[in-house]
Amino acid sequence: MKVLVTAFAMDAHFNGVVPLAWALRAAGHDVRVASQPALTDSITRAGLTAVPVGTDHQVQAAMGAMAPGVFALHLNPDYLENRPELLDLEFLEASTSMLTAAFYAQINNDSMIDEMVDFAAWWRPDLVVWEPFTFGGAVAAQVTGAAQARLLWGPDLFLRVHDRFQQVLHEVPAERRDDALEEWLTWTLERHGAAFGPEVISGHWTIDQMPPSVRFATARPTVPMRFVPYNGPVPAVVPPWLRADPGRPRVLLTQGITERSTGFTGLPRAGELLASIAELDAEVVATVKAEEREGLPPLPGNVRVVDSLSLHVVLPSCAAVVHHGGAGTWATAALHGVPQLALAWQWDDVFRAGQLEKLGAGIFLPPHGEGASAGRVRDRLAQVLAEPSFRQGAARIRAEMLRTPAPGAVVPTLEQLTARHRAPAGQGVRH
């Protein structure tokens, strides 16, 4: 079958779709990956066929213009579990409107969607797999009659909030309802002669890469799939020093791809943090961009600073990892049974870090304020290294992940679902 994989142009979001694209290709299916031109090199470096569509997004500027109150709540989404009273109609309408204008419609700009639809109408995919924010893929599937699947890289906070929004929205008269996301998608679909349907929000089914203990319960069709690490542009090379026994616990300090590429960061200053962690009886490996190394103070001999390193290469040798809470870093550490100290501060990172702590596989340390000083990070890391319970908790999550089918094993299920959901030939709006 023909499979169109779609992800907006950001490496961290693209990396999560690569192993499934490989699996589909290895099973003999024809795979194309559509995104804005900025992602083309990343797609082709992954050994996949790129379809550049539209113009590059300017999402960082748009996000910077968001209303501070709404932005702050989305940066710290613990309100989902701990402050449900905030999830009222006024807040949900405002946040949906703000995110639609400043995020969803930016990363799925009109030119990107239009050219993606044009390509799909020409190529006729049987299945469209879309990264959960890349609604352009959902639109292309809806217009052409392809089956469509959302591919999650983290807990499904989006649909959890969306479902709550739909619940409170339908408690008020129709004339008072304001759903900016549905309005934007309806307008976009109508431009291409298609109608809105719930699958444009949720897919015909969802492919979930999270371990069961971190998933939200849902009645929607879901295909569990094991997370397989792919670190994108970071060279997957095993350096000679990695094969040597350090003689003490090895600790990795990493900011992750998104933090390094966007400048958004929740970690304390690298030099201060490294100097403090180096006081522990551990070998410290830190990924620090070359331009930032000049500002580092002299560091002791137990600190090794590298520009970049594939996580799946180094983490199996580590006793702990300190990071920003990002999806790829979190999941790669979990897959290798490595205890984590997560300095999470935004989006689903906060929820994922909280679950990590609840499951006894690490510690969640919010990075802002006095809570995450370099000394506090050092002390909590010492706790993670000293207490065996953290490695036991990490081992339990690893076991969950290993029991989940790998990407290659879910391909037959995707074939069956595609046959069930795709429109018969010639019945799409564009055919």
Swiss-Prot record:
UniProt signal peptide: 1-23
SUPFAM superfamilies cross-referenced by the UniProt entry: UDP-Glycosyltransferase/glycogen phosphorylase
GO MF: hexosyltransferase activity; UDP-glycosyltransferase activity
Keywords: Antibiotic biosynthesis, Glycosyltransferase, Signal, Transferase
InterPro entries listed in its UniProt record: EryCIII-like_C, EryCIII-like_N, Glycosyl_450act, Glycosyltransferase_28, UDP_glucos_trans
Highest taxon, organism lineage: Bacteria
Catalytic activity of the protein: dTDP-beta-L-daunosamine + epsilon-rhodomycinone = rhodomycin D + dTDP + H(+)
Enzyme nomenclature, EC number: 2.4.1.-
Pathway connected to this protein: Antibiotic biosynthesis; daunorubicin biosynthesis; Antibiotic biosynthesis; carminomycin biosynthesis
Stated name of the protein: TDP-daunosamine transferase DnrS
